[in-house]
Structure formats: C-alpha cells, structure tokens
Design a protein with these regions (language model features):
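Short C-terminal domain-edge/linker segments immediately following a structured domain
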Residues: 40-47, 94-96, 120-121
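Conserved phosphate-binding/catalytic loop of the ribokinase/pfkB sugar-kinase fold
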Residues: 88, 92-93, 103-121
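A glycine-rich helix N-cap at a beta->alpha junction
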Residues: 79-95
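Glycine-rich nucleotide/cofactor/substrate-binding loop typically near the N-terminus or early
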Residues: 66, 100, 105
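Short, charged beta->alpha transition segments
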Residues: 50, 90, 99-101
C-alpha cells in the first residue's frame, strides 16, 4: 500500500489516432493506384503509444487528449484502458472525428504516413 501511495503518476499529453495500415509491394508514385495485400487497423498515436508503453512497464499513467464520439474513439479509449491507462482526462469531441493515420507499409518494411489529426487539434 505504501509503495502504491508513493508511486508517481506519469501524465501524457498527446495524440490518439487510429492507424489504418495497408501492405503494398511498394509505395505508390504520385497519381498511381496500387493493389495492397491486406489491411489492418491498430490503436495508435504518439501520445497513446507512450502512455501504453509506460503503463506496461508498471507506471501509473494518465492520458490527456481528445477523440471524437465515434467508433475509432471508442476503440482507442478501450485499448489504452485495457493496458491500465487512466483516460479520465481524454475529452470526447462531438463535432470532430477521431484522428487517423494512413500508413502504407512496403515489402521491405518501410512506411509512409499521412495523419489527419481530427479531434487531436
């Protein structure tokens, strides 16, 4: 109990984004369309990733950020809460969608990322 009382809380202020990942043989050229091999979604965002990493290492973590009132926002909150992150200070934005990161991953593991920050801003 004493150790828990003395434990410092790490506060992370940052982004929560849903990562939308498509695997492709290579990155497309401007104006080009490629066929990808498969598509995946992952909870992400620099802030959320840091919060989860710290929580997994045993720290008490509080996340401050903003997501939309949408499926991606619900998924992100559930994901970080699963790892023990306190989301009491993550706001839900009625008018703006949750941020997304569009990620292309090529056959060599190199990525390109375009972020639409949405509610993070």
């Amino acid at each position: 109990m004493l150790q828990e009382m003395l434990m410092t809380t790490i506060v992370v202020v940052g982004s929560l984004n849903m990562d939308l990942v498509v695997h492709a043989p290579r990155h497309p050229l401007p104006g080009e369309t490629l066929i990808g091999s498969h598509f995946q979604t992952f909870p992400g965002g620099k802030g959320a990733n840091q919060a989860v990493a710290a929580a997994r290492l045993g720290a008490r973590v509080c996340m401050i950020g903003r997501v939309g009132i949408d499926t991606f926002g619900d998924t992100l909150l559930a994901a970080v809460q699963y790892d023990g992150v306190d989301t009491s200070f993550v706001q839900r934005d009625l008018n703006t969608a949750t941020g997304v990161a569009l990620i292309t991953l090529d056959a060599h593991g190199q990525n390109t990322i375009v972020v639409a920050p949405g509610a993070n801003m």
